[in-house]
Design a protein with these regions (language model features):
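C-terminal interaction appendages of subunits in large macromolecular complexes
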Residues: 1-287
């Protein structure tokens, strides 16, 4: 009998609980969703491509197999289709394009249209936002942005004799266009080049003056600096060429009248930066 009494007590307590907490079910039972789970796709593996910038000012992204069958012509064959810059690149890399207005334009390789070697490429004006009508590319390199800091320092030389040296890491900028160097009014950027393991810089002006000075005398400055003076350029003259030099190098000078001479690098005496330079060529009335 005690068992019956116990069951009666339990039944009574359960009824009291049910009455006290009686309300609608707060959760719903729904049919299982059998649609497949959407899994985020992994990024495609980087693809190897050829990137070329031609004498006609066109960028081309080419399949390496097609390029092997039909390479671009040499400069002697076709200076318009000759590649002024040619890279074996990957689609996860970025072109850093430096212009004579002192700007840098990062351009993802993956954004370029793939074309056949003989097909028309893309003009810079069509792929670089903010490019001025008279703005021209001087130098470019292709690299993963995470690796920019591994590049050597970058040198900027202007027509009025300014030089700036900046660590490549300063150009890891996430923007479609940014200032690479502060070019003063009335001046124009002439050359951009990586600071190779060469000892000196050699500059020539239109009037035949030249100066050779140590690369170590050029301080490393920030990205938007204007640089330091490397040569005192006279009024009416301008720097027309700059390169890096070692004692084992030879230099060939050519004039617009067809005169030429070859010199050893040791013939160019090293001077202090910011000098007036010395005559490398004496012009007579015939050129």
């Amino acid at each position: 009998h005690s068992e019956k009494k116990l069951l009666a007590v339990i039944r009574k307590e359960l009824q009291e609980i049910a009455e006290e907490f009686a309300d609608e079910r707060r959760t719903t039972i729904e049919k299982a969703d059998e649609s497949p789970l959407e899994v985020e796709e992994e990024a495609a593996a980087p693809e190897e491509v050829i990137v070329a910038f031609t004498g006609a000012g066109q960028l081309k992204r080419i399949n390496p197999a097609l390029y092997k069958k039909t390479p671009l012509p040499t400069r002697a064959e076709d200076d318009k289709e000759f590649a002024d810059f040619l890279f074996m690149a990957k689609t996860d890399e970025t072109l850093l394009i430096f212009t004579d207005h002192g700007n840098c334009y990062p351009l993802p390789v993956a954004s370029l249209n793939e074309v056949k070697p003989k097909e028309r490429g893309q003009l810079l004006s069509g792929v670089l936002a903010g490019l001025e009508d008279d703005e021209k590319a001087l130098w470019m390199t292709c690299i993963r942005m995470a690796d920019v800091g591994h590049l050597p320092d970058i040198l900027f030389i202007t027509r009025q004799g300014m030089v700036k040296r900046t660590a490549a890491a300063d150009y890891d900028v996430r923007s479609k266009k940014f200032a690479a160097v502060n070019v003063k009014d009335g001046d124009r950027l002439l050359t951009v080049l990586p600071a190779a393991s060469r000892d000196d810089l050699l500059l020539f002006t239109r009037s035949g003056l030249c100066i050779r000075f140590s690369l170590d005398s050029v301080p490393v400055q920030g990205r938007v600096a204007a640089g330091v003076r490397c040569m005192q350029v006279e009024d009416g003259d301008e720097v027309i060429w700059c390169g890096q030099l070692q004692d084992s190098d030879q230099i060939v000078l050519l004039t617009d009248r067809g005169y030429a001479k070859r010199l050893l690098s040791v013939d160019f005496e090293k001077q202090n930066r910011n000098g007036k330079g010395v005559k490398s060529f004496y012009f007579n009335k015939n050129g």
